[in-house]
Design a protein with these regions (language model features):
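A detector of single, family-specific signature residues
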Residues: 1-394
């Protein structure tokens, strides 16, 4: 059996090959991230029989290489870089060089025999890319809202007394045309009242009058052109991001309708299209896990609470180990599912009746929701309570 270790970089990779005993069969050899480099790699490796290729899952650089090797029939394992670094340190290879990493990865594979991985199907990969793009847009949107808050606090701090949400279309429409308190000078109430902010609604006379009067006595009136430009740019960015998020949400939902598991997950009350897409993006097929408990452990939702004497833990059931982003994404769907799913609501209420704190009971409900996710994926059927393990139902 041959074990190939490949250290991944942006432009040049390094490979090394060892046998079952760790004896070096191919000394560390570099190859480039292009067609010529891949040809060199395949020439060195030869036939894929009795060969395990091990790669560190570093950023996105491994994906083209993985696809090329998989198409040639190689078994490929994706490794956590932290595990390979720890292995190298234990092997007294403490000097960080690409050559040592390639050999260390190969020897790690020879000793640990990691299971081969596989790329997700194209539909899952597309959902994953779009969900993560949406995450970035949401982050950008939040950044712009925070920037706008800072600017409004300086240029027209009284504005948020009348328009609470600066991320709303109402706020960005007004602030784009009237970015600071000084910009309201000479503006009539009637003109401001006619301003449309979503194609249908107008500001209205009451709000217009309040803003015009507040601007006259605002403590931010001294701010000038620099603030006006920044506010306008922030509003334009928010409008653009809002349109992109709407379009992207529609794209994700259309893709989800073509995804078998993703569509089935929406049959669970509380799991809408965006949550189902998130589950598919982060988990692939939930049925790939050994059982529902393994899925819950991967997410980082544990079944028991820690108690000592009279102390009752308020964060029981959550562990820092696991998928924090997925846990956060499941919080609101769990609240919805507790309201809409009779079996989950009964389970939650039973825990509360036993004296469990609301947060502890909700974490337990999240775990049961994940068990339902696993059952739907495993049976490839829409959600029905009797397919969920007995412990999940009240």
């Amino acid at each position: 059996m041959r074990f190939v270790g490949i250290d991944i970089a942006a432009e040049t990779h390094v490979l090394a090959v060892v046998d079952d005993t760790g004896t070096v069969l191919v000394k560390p050899t570099s190859f480039t991230e292009d067609a010529a480099g891949y040809d060199r790699l395949l020439t060195v490796l030869g036939a894929p029989a009795d060969t395990l290729v091990a790669l560190e899952a570093t950023g996105h650089y491994w994906k083209n290489l993985f696809a090329t090797l998989a198409a040639r029939g190689f078994a490929i394992a994706l490794l956590n870089p932290l595990r390979t670094r720890r292995f190298a340190q234990e092997d007294l290879e403490r000097t960080k060089t690409d050559t040592i990493d390639a050999l260390g990865i190969a020897r790690f594979a020879a000793q640990k025999r990691p299971a081969p991985a596989r790329l997700p199907d194209p539909a899952t990969e597309e959902l994953r890319e779009l969900v993560r793009l949406r995450d970035r847009l949401v982050q950008d949107f939040g950044d712009r809202v925070r920037q706008l808050h800072r600017l409004v606090d300086l240029g027209f701090p009284e504005f948020t007394r009348y328009v609470r949400s600066l991320d709303s279309e109402l706020a960005t429409a007004i602030l784009h045309d009237y970015p600071t308190a000084a910009a309201f000078q000479g503006v009539s109430v009637a003109r401001l009242a006619r301003l449309r902010y979503d194609g249908r609604h107008t500001v209205g006379p009451d709000l217009a009058r309040q803003l015009v009067e507040a601007a006259k006595v605002s403590v931010g009136r001294h701010h000038g052109e620099a603030y006006r430009i920044q506010v306008r740019f922030a509003c334009e960015d928010l409008d653009l991001l809002r349109r992109r998020l709407r379009a992207l949400t529609g794209d994700i939902e259309r893709l989800l309708r073509q995804h078998e598991v993703g569509t089935l997950l929406t049959s669970i009350d509380g799991i809408g299209p965006q949550t189902a897409a998130r589950l598919v993006a982060e988990l692939g097929d939930p049925a790939q896990f050994r059982d529902a408990a393994a899925l819950a452990a991967y997410v980082g939702v544990i079944p028991a609470t820690r108690q000592s004497g009279k102390h009752r833990a308020t964060r029981a059931g959550l562990t820092p180990i696991g998928h924090a982003a997925l846990r956060a994404a499941l919080w609101m769907p769990t609240l919805t599912a507790v309201r809409k799913n009779p079996w989950l609501r009964a389970y939650y209420e039973r825990l509360r009746a036993r004296g469990k704190l609301p947060k502890v009971a909700l974490v337990a409900a999240m775990r049961k929701l994940l068990i339902a996710v696993y059952a739907v994926a495993k049976h490839r059927r829409p959600f029905v309570p009797h397919l969920v393990p007995q412990e999940t139902r009240a």
